[in-house]
Amino acid sequence: MIKKLLLIFLLTYPQFSHSSVEVDFNIWLKKFKITAQKEGISEETINNSLKNAKYLEQVIKYDRYQPEFFEDTETYIKKRATRSRMLKAKALLIKNKKLFDEVEKKFKVEKELLLALWGIETNFGKNVGKMDIISSLATLSFDKRRSEFFSKELIILLKLIDQKLIDVDTLYGSWAGAFGNFQFMPSSIENYAIDYDKNNKIELKQSLPDAVASAANYISKIGWEYQSSCFHKVELTKPISKKYINTSAKKIKNYRTINLWKKKGIVDIEQISDKNKAALVIPDLAVIEENKNSPAFLVFDNYEKILKWNRSLRFGVTVCTLANMIKNEI
């Protein structure tokens, strides 16, 4: 099924004349500069920041093909929540124990979760991305699929540059415009990033204290419940109506008591209180319906908080899986 989806993607991906797209992009860019001026951004910042902005066709290809759409859950988890990554997290915790202990105490976010996010987002800072973020955001703003979202992100980024909180020369990251050790979008930088080392710059790539504290602040402010569970992998012993099953990350629905899930034939949850509430998530049903053995998870409130970080069912399960692996090792 996955191979079929990839083939469909390759066959249906639109092919345009690159030169004609560049002409249209440059027309759009001129209009965007006017919009940026109306947002109160200085002409100097607009010109300096956008002078090298260009249309990146590769960004559109990345946008149309994302692992969340084509990898099944078990493959997704196995590639990311690895033993080698867990051991690397353990070594980094030993090296930076004072920082992680301090941040956990201050923000009430477990060090294991922060290490898991760091490991999955950028392999602990090794893969922060090499794309020109301004060009990436400009390309995605010009593109029709999510133009409004990315245009807002680009405006926010220009404002941060204008306020001298971000150095434009450091802005290299992911194809989607995310930046630094924990891959913050501009809106996340604006809302949650912290100058933790007090040098009057937010340095999410160069400064580990800034990066870790900013990630903890983000998770804390979106409502993370300290030392509470994220999910529990379960088995289904009989069919369950699809109305009870979450296959979309947009909003987790149908929280029910553990006692009800037991009556529905879900096993391996004896250690959880019958009064606790959880929702049933089966990520693969959305894409790979013929997979009758799709992994199933009962998820709790904290799982939804991870989805606010990255709205992907598989990402949420994978982060919590790696966090549990790290916790069991240290």
Segments from the language model and where they lie:
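Secretory-pathway/luminal and periplasmic proteins that interact with or process carbohydrate-rich
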Residues: 55-62, 122-131, 143-147, 164-169, ...
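Sec-dependent N-terminal signal peptides
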Residues: 4-13
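Short, functionally critical alpha-helical segments immediately adjacent to catalytic or ligand/cofactor-binding
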Residues: 36, 45-57, 108-125, 157-161, ...
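Boundary at the C-terminal end of the N-terminal hydrophobic targeting segment
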Residues: 17-19
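C-terminal soluble interaction/assembly domains
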Residues: 234-330
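An acidic, Gly/Ser/Thr/Pro-rich helix-cap/linker signature
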Residues: 22-95, 101-104
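Acidic, glycine-anchored loop motifs typical of Ca2+
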Residues: 196-204
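Substrate-binding/active-site groove segments that recognize
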Residues: 132-141, 154, 179-194, 215
